[in-house]
Design a protein with these regions (language model features):
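ATP-binding N-terminal substructure of ATP-dependent carboxylate-amine bond-forming enzymes
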Residues: 1-96, 127-130
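Active-site nucleotide/adenylate-binding loops and adjacent lid/helix of ATP-dependent enzymes
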Residues: 102-146
Length: 146
């Protein structure tokens, strides 16, 4: 039976867990135990935080999965890419992960390729915030880049 590692076990990842099982995969799921619906639906559940890449990698070396994946989580994508790379499995590039997990880089990539996106600027500590947003209109949303 093929084995799949899924990073994350909340309500967003649970449909992925169920689909993988339906497709005949043995599911190995990593996440915090609290609030992890996937703990009940996965074949194997490991109560390890999705940011503890080395601890998960150690388990993955024992499991020897055929694939590592996630869904609906920027943070989990970072771990998936790291694990897959270390295990010699197909994975996204470092640049792809950076662009998909950094809001400013993502907006720049969208703009560069003609994908409609709201106006955006990057502002760092010490910058003149008023000048940076002077040409923007309200309502305005302020978010961290990661």
């Amino acid at each position: 039976m093929k084995k799949i590692v899924i990073i994350g076990a909340n309500s967003f990842q649970n449909p992925l867990i169920l689909k993988a099982k339906e497709m005949g995969y043995e599911t190995h799921v990593f996440a915090w135990k609290d609030g992890s619906i996937g703990e009940r639906t996965a074949d194997y559940f490991y109560p390890i935080s999705i940011v503890e890449k080395e601890a998960i990698l150690e388990e993955c070396r024992r499991i020897q999965p055929d694939a590592v994946t996630t869904i609906a989580s920027d943070l989990a994508n970072i771990t998936v890419q790291y694990l897959a790379e270390q295990l010699g499995l197909p994975h996204n590039s470092d640049n792809c992960i950076y662009i998909s997990t950094n809001k400013f880089a993502m907006r720049e990539a969208f703009s560069k390729h003609g994908v409609p996106t709201p106006g955006f600027v990057s502002v760092c500590e010490g910058d003149d915030y008023a000048a940076a947003v002077a040409d923007m209109q309200f309502p305005m949303i302020v978010k961290p880049t990661d």
